[in-house]
Design a protein with these regions (language model features):
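Post-transcriptional modification and biogenesis factors for structured RNAs
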Residues: 1-153
Length: 153
């Protein structure tokens, strides 16, 4: 729904060698200037796949584990033991994932702990929190092991 969030998520995916799967309807064009601006110059680093619906995604990746981010979940995102290839599923910012999608998958629904008074987090922030927890558990595969310290003159 919000082009800037999608751009931020694309940048996160680019920086971590993650594929970004988008499910139609998107509500904006992937070429939207706000999407492009938020993703900066990282677009060549991210594999973006657009699917007509969630069933198309399931059909293309039938052997993957899917985790559904929802404020309604009983399990937190850090209780899961993530594996390479796991799929993290998020809904639109304004309404989250539909109840019909969550029926029957309650054990794979995850949430980020927060105070009762808050409805939800910004979508791109939630994606980053959960994605980095998964990466942390997997010991940050394929990512840079050390930073580049500024050398004194």
């Amino acid at each position: 729904e919000i082009p800037g969030n999608t751009g931020n998520i694309a940048r996160l995916c680019a920086a971590n060698h993650m594929t970004l799967h988008l499910i139609k309807p998107l509500g904006f064009s992937i070429d939207d200037k706000h999407v492009k601006r938020a993703g900066l110059d990282y677009w060549h680093l991210v594999d973006v796949q657009v699917h007509e619906n969630i069933q198309e995604l399931y059909a293309k990746y039938p052997d993957r584990r899917y985790f559904y981010a929802t404020t309604k979940a009983k399990h937190t995102h850090s209780e899961v033991k993530y594996e390479i290839g796991d799929m993290l599923v998020f809904g639109p910012e304004s309404r989250g994932l539909p109840e019909s999608l969550l029926e029957g998958v309650e054990e794979t629904c995850i949430r980020i702990p927060m105070v009762d008074e808050a409805r939800s987090l910004n979508l791109s922030n939630a994606v980053a929190i959960i994605a980095y927890e998964a990466m942390r558990q997997l010991d940050y595969p394929d990512l840079k092991a050390e930073g580049n310290w500024i050398q004194p003159k």
